[in-house]
């Protein structure tokens, strides 16, 4: 344990020093045209304009909200399982604490490898095919398949298959979903605000997952019901994505 912390401290120190040494040196932008225009805009900003800037889009925003719901549901379904792996392995699969820890380590390696590979492939493929929503939906369906496996294999192998198949789908999803979100923005003038709203789906999904999981476990006394409900959430997310019209 002590050696691990020491190695981590050295790595943090070295990377910090290297970053400072090689960081690009740029001249101050204080006198640039963009900086002056930004300062003028801040000076003219009033309270009404500020409050209006926080209002979600209301025009030409059908696809925007479908993308928002698609992301929210997928993140919810994914975190219902990935965020509770330890409890699922112990209470649902019947593994000991030691075996659960070892299984989670293996799952982490599996999911990391497949996520990197699929994200590296699906991003360029999406650009080449000029397809966004279809690839995002395919990734969602693959995630749903991975989530469904432990329903029929309530053991360590089933969870490892979840990590592999679900991780592959998640890699496809995260590589293309943000590009899809950019394509459905209703206004280029408010792109930053609207992207911020879309990204809130990540946080809301992660916050809702413990609430939903806790309610299900309390109601059923088991973790078994998590899997079908998570599958439904992810597939509903795919449906919302496919309902988008603006993007292929």
Located regions from the model:
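A membrane-interface helix-boundary motif in multi-pass transporters
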Residues: 1-10, 215-234
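Structural signature of the two symmetry-related core transmembrane helices
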Residues: 134-149
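Short amphipathic helix-loop junctions that connect adjacent transmembrane helices
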Residues: 83-102
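Juxtamembrane intracellular "pre-TM" segments in multi-pass secondary transporters
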Residues: 26-69
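Intracellular juxtamembrane helix-capping segments at the cytosolic ends
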Residues: 172-186
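Helix-to-loop junctions at the C-terminal end of transmembrane segments
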Residues: 118-131, 217
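Multi-pass alpha-helical transporter architecture, strongest
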Residues: 16-22, 173, 208, 228-248
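A late C-terminal transmembrane helix in Major Facilitator Superfamily
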Residues: 189-219
């Amino acid at each position: 344990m002590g050696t691990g912390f020491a190695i981590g401290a050295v790595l943090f120190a070295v990377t910090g020093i290297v970053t400072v040494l090689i960081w690009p040196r740029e001249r101050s932008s204080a006198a640039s045209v963009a900086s002056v225009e930004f300062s003028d805009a801040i000076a003219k900003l009033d309270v009404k304009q500020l409050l209006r800037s926080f209002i979600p889009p209301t025009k030409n925003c059908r696809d925007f909200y479908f993308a928002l719901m698609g992301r929210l549901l997928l993140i919810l379904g994914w975190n219902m399982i990935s965020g509770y792996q330890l409890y699922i392995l112990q209470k649902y699969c019947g593994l000991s604490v030691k075996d659960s820890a070892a299984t989670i380590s293996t799952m982490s390696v599996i999911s990391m490898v497949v996520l990197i590979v699929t994200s590296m492939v699906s991003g360029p493929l999406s650009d080449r095919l000029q397809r966004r929503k279809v690839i995002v939906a395919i990734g969602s369906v693959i995630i749903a398949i991975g989530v469904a496996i432990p329903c029929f294999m309530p053991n360590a192998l089933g969870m490892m298959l979840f990590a592999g198949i679900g991780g592959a789908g998640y890699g496809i999803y995260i590589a293309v979903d943000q590009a899809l979100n950019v394509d459905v923005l209703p206004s280029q003038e408010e792109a930053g605000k609207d992207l911020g709203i879309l990204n809130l789906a990540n946080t809301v999904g992660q916050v809702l997952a413990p609430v939903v999981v806790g309610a299900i476990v309390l109601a059923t006394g088991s973790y078994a019901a998590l899997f079908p409900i998570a599958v439904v959430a992810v597939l509903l997310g795919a449906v919302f994505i496919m309902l988008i019209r603006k993007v292929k």
